[in-house]
Structures are given as structure tokens and as C-alpha cells.
């Protein structure tokens, strides 16, 4: 009689947060480029930036300003949207309001909770 051993290997995806952090890192280091004459190489617009590698994120056109409405892209802008005054992230008022300022409103809401004792 013989014994049999079973070995299973698999690849595991990183957490969603890890993937997001890596993408954000690529985004923050993205380089604006133009095409070379041969069409095979990319040339950074900023001469002080190193030549991008195959793993670098590059772009060729600036994004429109998401602060203002833009019919062509379908962006409604950020004016009138709710923001988080305590957040320093993209949902925070300092970033979302694009320097226009914002009004902070403190509201009290009373509801019947239908509590029973």
C-alpha cells in the first residue's frame, strides 16, 4: 500500500487597498509624453524627467478641469456638491470646492424612533 500526498498551489490577489495604493502611486508618478519622429519611442515633455520605462504610466493630453462643468465630457463640475469638511482627501471641501470656498451647515434632525420600553 502506498501513500499519496496532494499539494495545491494558487496565486492570491492582493487586497483592494493594496491595488488602489499601487495605482495611486503610478498615477502620482505619471509622465506627460509626446511621440518621437519614428513613432516608436516616447519623449517626456519635461526634459528633467527620465525616459519612461515599460512599467511607467504615461499620458499625452491633460485632463479637463473637473471643477467646472464640461458638456463635451459630461462632467457637471463640483459646484453645489456636498463635501466632507474634515477630510483631506478628494472628497474633502478644500479639494472638491476648487478654492471657491464653502459653507458649513450644522443641522439637527429629530425623528420618532418608535422606541419601546
Curated annotation (Swiss-Prot):
Glycosylation sites: 84
A molecular function GO annotation: signaling receptor binding
A Pfam family hit: wnt
N-terminal signal peptide: none
Keywords of this entry: Developmental protein, Disulfide bond, Extracellular matrix, Glycoprotein, Lipoprotein, Secreted, Wnt signaling pathway
InterPro entries assigned to the protein according to its UniProt record, in alphabetical order: Wnt, Wnt_C
Keyword Disulfide bond: yes
GO terms, biological process: Wnt signaling pathway
Function: Ligand for members of the frizzled family of seven transmembrane receptors. Probable developmental protein. May be a signaling molecule which affects the development of discrete regions of tissues. Is likely to signal over only few cell diameters.
Family membership: Belongs to the Wnt family.
Protein's name in the database: Protein Wnt-6
Species whose genome carries this gene: Strongylocentrotus purpuratus (Purple sea urchin)
Gene: WNT-6
Amino acid at each position: 500500500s502506498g501513500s499519496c500526498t496532494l499539494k495545491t498551489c494558487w496565486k492570491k490577489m492582493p487586497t483592494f487597498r493594496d491595488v488602489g495604493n499601487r495605482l495611486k502611486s503610478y498615477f502620482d508618478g505619471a509622465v506627460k509624453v509626446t511621440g518621437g519622429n519614428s513613432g516608436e519611442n516616447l519623449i517626456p515633455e519635461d526634459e528633467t524627467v527620465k525616459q519612461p520605462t515599460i512599467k511607467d504610466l504615461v499620458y499625452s493630453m491633460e485632463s479637463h478641469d473637473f471643477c467646472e462643468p464640461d458638456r463635451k465630457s459630461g462632467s457637471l463640475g463640483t459646484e453645489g456638491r456636498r463635501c466632507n469638511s474634515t477630510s483631506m482627501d478628494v472628497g474633502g471641501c478644500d479639494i472638491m470646492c476648487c478654492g471657491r470656498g464653502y459653507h458649513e451647515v450644522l443641522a439637527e434632525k429629530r425623528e420618532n424612533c418608535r422606541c419601546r420600553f
